[in-house]
Amino acid sequence: MMKKALILTSALALSIIAGCSNQDEGTKNGSNSANKEATTKSTNEKKETNNKVSFKDNEAKLNDLKIKITETKVIQVGEKGNEYGKKPVFAIWYETTNLSDKEINPTTGWMAVFKAVQDNNPNSVNTLEIGGLPDDQFLDSQLETIKKDGTVKNAVAYELDDLETPVKLIATQGISGDKLGEQIFNIK
């Protein structure tokens, strides 16, 4: 029941945060490594603006918000953070900073920017499903509105389909906006 309420609230907030995506983007080139587990590949964009939007070095920068990934790990079924899941999860801890006067919370900010993929199907894109909240300390703060220039911590988990294939995190400028970049996380 709580999961359904969270998803419904998130969907509503996603429609609000979709306004975060200003379709003008800066030019991004190159490839950087974020840490020993991850590499970042920025995409080339054709549009230019004064605002630099990107996803590299574990950080997504958009016009209205910034999301910094601080930790990742695989949590097995039954372990703390995945007590009720049916599959292992890839858990991500992050900080969301609101750079605007818009109503943004950490959960909808994340969902508007990121999707996770495990490329283990030769015929279709395998987008991972969101799992339960992997860290109970964020139960009360995950949907709180972040003040302008304020930063709130949160976590998210994706249900893994296997424990071999790396997870590709893809960032976009809002829900259906241009791709900002992608980062590969090894889960072994």
Regions inferred by a protein language model and the residue ranges of each:
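Short structured motifs
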Residues: 53-56, 75-80, 137-142, 153-154
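The feature marks short-to-medium sequence segments in extracytoplasmic or secretory-pathway proteins
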Residues: 97-147
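Hydrophobic residues positioned within well-ordered beta-strands of beta-sheet architectures
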Residues: 67, 90-92, 154-156
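N-terminal, intrinsically disordered, polar/charged segments of Gram-positive cell-envelope systems
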Residues: 7, 11, 15, 21-70
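Positively charged n-region of N-terminal signal peptides that target proteins for export
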Residues: 1-5
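Surface-exposed edge beta-strand/loop patches
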Residues: 111, 145-188
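A short, structured loop/turn motif at beta-sheet edges
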Residues: 61-63, 99, 117-124, 148, ...
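Short, solvent-exposed beta-strand/turn "edge" segments of beta-rich domains on protein surfaces
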Residues: 73-91, 103-105, 143-147
